Amino acid sequence: KDVVGAALDAPYRDVPFESVFVADASRHGAHEINEALRAGLDVVLAPGVFELDDSIRMARPGAVVMGLGYATLVAPASGAACVIADDAGGMRLASVVLQASEVPAGDSSLLRWGGDGSASDPSVLSDVFARVGGPGSLNVRANVMMEVAASNVILDNIWLWRADHAELAPGEQPRPGEQYHLVVPGECSVKNGLIVDGDDVTAYGLAVEHTDQDQVIWRGERGRTYFYQCELPYDVNQ
């Protein structure tokens, strides 16, 4: 009674489970996931860490890639993106972590969302987190965490994080007042968190933290953001 919020009786698409491919990080990689998407299946990523050797490619209208337990997609060592989309409308990417690798310096992104997009059936990226840093090496890098070139895309709870702290190396002493390694320029390098070139892109919950240059570059027209968190790097020289 007197509920305020999303209409739970709105039209929806019911996907039978025989139309779903469940990917297991211990047995499946980008090749199997891309084969399933090309065959018209939607993809559920079981909890785990997927060490990708190629990009996951989404191009079919209505295609869905959804993680369980925040499945982690580790970027290919070649510098290719974790996910590349040619937005044909109605596509969904949800509940995944995109993780940077040690890659050559260059024009690398963790996610490239291109294509035309659809005003009548917008694609949605929900609960998508990206990180440059965290576990392991301080030499991971990316040029940009997320690029959205398609129009009419909806971003729902996006967190794009360059590490500010990391685990101490064996024998390393923290700075006074710190318990962890404080990340400095040249470590966990990433220029920008989000670049938007598409028009009519809407973000509901956008957090971008600690990038080396502009946190967000928004060149598309009529963009909207509802809640934006911006954390600058600790070093003012950045």
Regions found by a protein language model. Name each.
Residues K1-Q238:
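Extracellular/periplasmic carbohydrate-active domains that bind, remodel
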